[in-house]
Amino acid sequence: MNCGIKMKVIIPVSPINSLKTRLSEFLSGEERKNLLLNMLKDIIKALDGLDIVIVSRDEEILDFAKNELKAETIKEKYKGLNNAIKQAFEEIEDKEVIIIPADIPLIKKKHIEDILKLSKNYDLIIAPSRGGGTNLLYLKSKDLIEIKYEGFSFLKHLEEAKKRNLRYYIYDSFLISVDINTPEDLGEIFIHGNDTYTKNYLKSLGIDVEPKHSSAGRFVVKRR
């Protein structure tokens, strides 16, 4: 990976007490916290060699980022994802940025290498989530567009790029599109995440996946 590029990777992280509420019937609060920490470890592994800053209001997250992940940290001042990213833009000196959520543990170093190569020819690179969100956003300059996360942000960011006549590229990756919000999402980790901290952690909890031979889904996520 070309580490000579002056670029910052921004990872916004929600407070622990509001983490992954749709998993609350499947994982305890402590387990959801540890799931997040393992997902962050997988993401940091993919970003090896790049400068990373984690933005959060949660002191435990910031301590983990600083001491375990060796990342820079920014204490979030205002509520809301867009405000957190705007604050990071104001506090970092770097011009080029990549924004990545904290719940895409299947991202690989190869994806980041691809993004860095593409960045030579494009102003904006975007990878969609399965639900129409934005799971990776590269900006050649952090002031290129108005950040519009939440809702169908993929379409909003594309509209921003078109409105400003930017050179943009849609990086369509299934592995990046998988963000973890529901028990069903955990099944993708078992199928595609063999080398991840996240899968190893889920296995330690007695979680497993079985194929589902019906039109109602591909698999069933179970806990022993």
UniProtKB/Swiss-Prot annotation:
Thermal effects: Retains all activity when heated up to 90 degrees Celsius for 10 minutes and retained 38% activity after 10 minutes at 100 degrees Celsius.
Pathway as given in its UniProt record: Cofactor biosynthesis; coenzyme F420 biosynthesis
Cited Pfam families: CofC (PF01983)
Biological processes annotated in GO: F420-0 metabolic process
Repressor found in the keyword field: no
Enzyme class name: transferase
EC numbers, comma separated: 2.7.7.68
Alphabetized Gene3D superfamilies for the sequence: Spore Coat Polysaccharide Biosynthesis Protein SpsA, Chain A
Keyword Acetylation: no
Domain of life (superkingdom): Archaea
Reaction catalysed by this enzyme: (2S)-2-phospholactate + GTP + H(+) = (2S)-lactyl-2-diphospho-5'-guanosine + diphosphate
Cleavable signal peptide: none
UniProt keyword terms in alphabetical order: GTP-binding, Nucleotide-binding, Nucleotidyltransferase, Transferase
Function noted in UniProt: Guanylyltransferase that catalyzes the activation of (2S)-2-phospholactate (2-PL) as (2S)-lactyl-2-diphospho-5'-guanosine, via the condensation of 2-PL with GTP. It is involved in the biosynthesis of coenzyme F420, a hydride carrier cofactor. Is able to utilize other purine nucleotides including ATP, dGTP and ITP as cosubstrates in place of GTP but with a lower activity. Does not display lactate kinase activity.
Family membership: Belongs to the CofC family.
Stored HAMAP family: CofC
Protein's recorded name: 2-phospho-L-lactate guanylyltransferase
Lineage: Archaea, Methanobacteriati, Methanobacteriota, Methanomada group, Methanococci
